[in-house]
C-alpha cells in the first residue's frame, strides 16, 4: 500500500477532517491532499515528525470513537493485533500506526 493510500484510509476510517491534520502537522491542506491523492510525499527530512503527529491524531480518534476492534479488522493487512491492556492502548495504537506509515512511506519512495 502506498503512503497516500494508507493515509487516506486512516482519514476515512477515523472521519478526521483534513483541516485537523493540517493544523496538527503544520502543513497546508493542499499538501495533505497531494499526499493522499497525487502520490506526492513529504520530504525525508520531515517524515518522521509528520508520522509521529499523524499517528497520535489517528490513535486518539480511534480510542475516542471506541473503534479499536474495527480498526484491527480494517487494517489487519498492515497492523497486527496484539494483546495490550487498556492503559497502554493509545501508545500501542500510536506506535503501530506510526510504524505502518513509515513502511508505506519507504515503499512509496522506492517506486
Where are these regions (language model features)?
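Helix-turn-helix DNA-binding elements, focusing on the entry/boundary residues of the two helices
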Residues: 7, 18, 29, 47, ...
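The alpha-helix within a helix-turn-helix
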Residues: 11, 22, 51, 55
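A short glycine/small-residue-enriched secondary-structure motif
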Residues: 24-31, 69-73
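Recognition helix of helix-turn-helix/homeodomain-like DNA-binding domains
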Residues: 26-43
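Short amphipathic recognition helices of helix-turn-helix/homeodomain-type DNA-binding modules
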Residues: 46-110
Amino acid at each position: 500500500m502506498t503512503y497516500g493510500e494508507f493515509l487516506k484510509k486512516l482519514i476515512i476510517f477515523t472521519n478526521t477532517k483534513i483541516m485537523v491534520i493540517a493544523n496538527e502537522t503544520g502543513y497546508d491542506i493542499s499538501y495533505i491532499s497531494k499526499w493522499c491523492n497525487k502520490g506526492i510525499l513529504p520530504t525525508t527530512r520531515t517524515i518522521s515528525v509528520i508520522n509521529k503527529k499523524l499517528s497520535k491524531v489517528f490513535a486518539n480518534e480511534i480510542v475516542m470513537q471506541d473503534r479499536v476492534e474495527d480498526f484491527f479488522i480494517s487494517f489487519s493487512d498492515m497492523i497486527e493485533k496484539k494483546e495490550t491492556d487498556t492503559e497502554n492502548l493509545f501508545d500501542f495504537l500510536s506506535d503501530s500506526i506510526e510504524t505502518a506509515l513509515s513502511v508505506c512511506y519507504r515503499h512509496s519512495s522506492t517506486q
